[in-house]
Amino acid sequence: DGEQVVFDTNAEAQGHDFFRIGGMDISKDGRWMLYGTDTSGDERYDFRIRSLETGKELPEVFKGIGGACFTPDAQWVFYVKLDDAWRPYAVMRHRVGTPVTDDVEVYHEQDERFWVGIGLSFDERNLVIGTGSKTTTEVLLLSTDDPEGEFRAFIPREQDVEYDVSFSRFEGAGERGEDIPLAVVYHNALNPNFEIDVIDMRSHEPPYRLGEGVRVAVGSPYGCEYGDEVEPGASGMPIGTPYSNPCNPAILQGAHGLGIEGISIHRHYVALQYRAESLTHIAVMTKDAAAEDFLAGRPWKFTELVPHALEDDWDVDESVDEINEERAEVWGALDQLAAAQGEGSAVHGVSRKAMTSSDGATADAMPGETRRLYSIGVGGNPSYDAPRMRYSFSSYTRPGELHDIDPATGEDRLLKRATVLGGFEPREYMERRVWVTARDGERIPVSLVWRRDVPACDSAMFVTGYGAYEISSDPGF
């Protein structure tokens, strides 16, 4: 009755100077737990199988491995071996209840640049081996109905091409009411900022090819090293050049600096994650609408997810005069910084035209300024069948929040908000993003945060930033 504690780390750690969990998998029937522990700190894990009914463990122990997973029926364990350099390089198959000395190697990665992983697909219909280097990836599949079969490449490896694949289906959308099995491929073979293709797997058995299927979303090639392969002259254009593509949903048309970051297709909804104007975005639509667009061969009709709480703040809390006053403070601070750093600074030459030409009649964001300034991301949605989607968001002045939303109705519920001690009040702080032009002509986003009652032009400024390896300094509390 009620909740059951399946693993108490504090109790398990008794008698060990070091103790760390290295992964956990619960069988689909809830009877068995596969878990790994490291008691020496060397990041090699010993995995064991424990009965959740009796608490007893099976005799087999998988020593010094990198990770492991059950098949859905918990009759088999697949796990990853490590070499002397701690590289995951091989996948082993184990029948539960037999000696580990009888285990069989089912995959061996010979190229030392590549690391190997094993897991189940989201729909639990396939075992998935993922192998990848810094610039190249490959996915191999094996049906969970045939665990003793041979893994096959879903798409053969191509040097300097990264791809990932997930699986879903359009329930009852076939001509005879059958399900349409889908492979959702995320790759950069044809576009440096990635694209998403959805393949109807009824067409043929794997292997497939990169670019096959229906293109759902395509990133911008502008300012990218290989952009000219997509569009002549694209690599020499500024990253923020507006990008349009007939395959893209309407909400992506004309986006600045568009990068595609992923998609998830659940039973009731589809969620697209992308980046534009250097900020993260989520777009959602119902599964039924996605199936209709897919079968009709037209762009999918996504709607951007905007947290209702933020919409309320923008629309109600600030008058036009207040917003224009804030703008004057922001640009005054930038003028001060530019004067201090001289003509060669990145902030020198920022245009004030939008502010000085404004007649104060509207509260719209001026060119070069971003009113939307927060991070948003999909997370915590492990169930394929759940009708609601969880997402999180945060900004420089708003503690992190966890919400769930019904994509069909738009009903948004706050589940949790981070607590800040000391009487913190978000409305006492302001945040804005402006764009400054660097010496090479590229536009750079600058986020500004300050207390409303602190004079922006006469106060000290703390400056920090980072930008490399496609790692962004996203807004966060």
Model-identified regions with their sequence ranges:
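Beta-strand C-termini and the immediately following turn/loop, strongest in propeller blades
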Residues: D1, I26-G41, F78-A85, R95, ...
